[in-house]
């Protein structure tokens, strides 16, 4: 599989997993209810009109604009990946692909519904969804790849 295809497949799989999971939750669990009713891990159907941790709640236009900017940045990174060696690898392109998937997954909800469907609750952490997980895992993955590639290439620019 070519590297470009790796990027697009990881993006498509992330979007599909996100949208399918939200469809299943919406079709089977009334808003505000959870399974189980209490406990450390719950599946709970909530509508989030904000971003992570519900910040910028009610500012859908800003969140849509930020998401569109995120899509543009991810696509730009894909097209200039040859200049970023840590990114022009299968793991780098998978990480970038799931970042794009998370951005697009939540953007679809915001444009279509005016809110994002969240449904995973772990402990006291704010409720989130597959798109949020894609974004988090992708960003952490890219950071780790960058750190490792900097050490492997002998980059000592931080000592200058």
Curated annotation (Swiss-Prot):
It holds the Pfam family Peptidase_A8. It is found in: Cell membrane. Its EC number is 3.4.23.36. The active site is at 118, 132. The chain crosses the membrane at residues 60-80, 84-104, 128-148. One of its GO terms (cellular component) is plasma membrane. It comes from the Bacteria. It is a multi-pass membrane protein. The keyword Cell membrane applies. It catalyses: Release of signal peptides from bacterial membrane prolipoproteins. Hydrolyzes -Xaa-Yaa-Zaa-|-(S,diacylglyceryl)Cys-, in which Xaa is hydrophobic (preferably Leu), and Yaa (Ala or Ser) and Zaa (Gly or Ala) have small, neutral side chains. GO terms for biological process: proteolysis. This protein specifically catalyzes the removal of signal peptides from prolipoproteins. Belongs to the peptidase A8 family. This is Lipoprotein signal peptidase. It comes from Dehalococcoides mccartyi (strain CBDB1). The lineage of its organism: Bacteria, Bacillati, Chloroflexota, Dehalococcoidia, Dehalococcoidales. The gene is lspA.
């Amino acid at each position: 599989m070519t590297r470009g295809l790796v990027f697009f497949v990881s993006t498509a799989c992330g979007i599909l997993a996100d949208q399918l999971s939200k469809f299943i939750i919406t079709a089977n669990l009334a808003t505000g209810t959870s399974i189980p009713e209490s406990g450390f891990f719950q599946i709970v159907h909530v509508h989030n009109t904000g971003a992570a941790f519900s910040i910028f709640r009610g500012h859908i236009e800003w969140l849509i604009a930020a998401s569109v900017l995120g899509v543009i940045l991810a696509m730009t990174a894909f097209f200039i990946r040859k200049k970023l060696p840590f990114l022009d690898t299968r793991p780098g392109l998978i990480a970038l692909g799931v970042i794009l998937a998370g951005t697009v997954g939540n953007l679809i909800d915001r444009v279509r519904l005016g809110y994002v469907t969240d449904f995973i609750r772990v402990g006291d952490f704010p409720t989130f969804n597959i798109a949020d997980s894609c974004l988090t895992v992708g960003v952490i993955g890219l950071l780790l790849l960058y750190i490792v590639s900097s050490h492997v290439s002998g980059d000592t620019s931080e000592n200058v």
